[in-house]
């Protein structure tokens, strides 16, 4: 499986630990979709922060994705749900380490 396929699978299953383990220790997620949902953008730095952030979001049902579809080796489209507000989004793996861990991923409105 590619990094983007693993990302979609972890997000759909709300597997915050599995999601965090896809990232390098200094991995980064930049999520720009939230501005469309009248929330602050997410800029999450580091595997541990990614784990804690999504544990909170999934646990309190403040974030989920629906209808994930991998469109190529680095991108996937899905519906991002921010506490009941849905946005069509596209995630892009921008950079990976030599051992295949995600170093930088962005999520933008589609």
Task: Describe every region a protein language model picked out.
Residues 17-18, 66:
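Short, flexible, glycine/charge-rich loop motifs used to bind or transfer phosphoryl groups or to couple energy/partner
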Residues 52-110:
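A beta-strand edge to alpha-helix "cap/lid" segment located at domain peripheries
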Residues 12, 20, 55-58:
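Alpha-helix boundary recognition
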Residues 25-68:
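A solvent-exposed, acidic/Ser-Thr-rich amphipathic alpha-helical stretch
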Residues 1-15:
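Short, aromatic-enriched amphipathic alpha-helices that serve as compact interaction elements
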Residues 7, 19-20, 27, 46, ...:
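Hydrophobic pocket/interface hotspot
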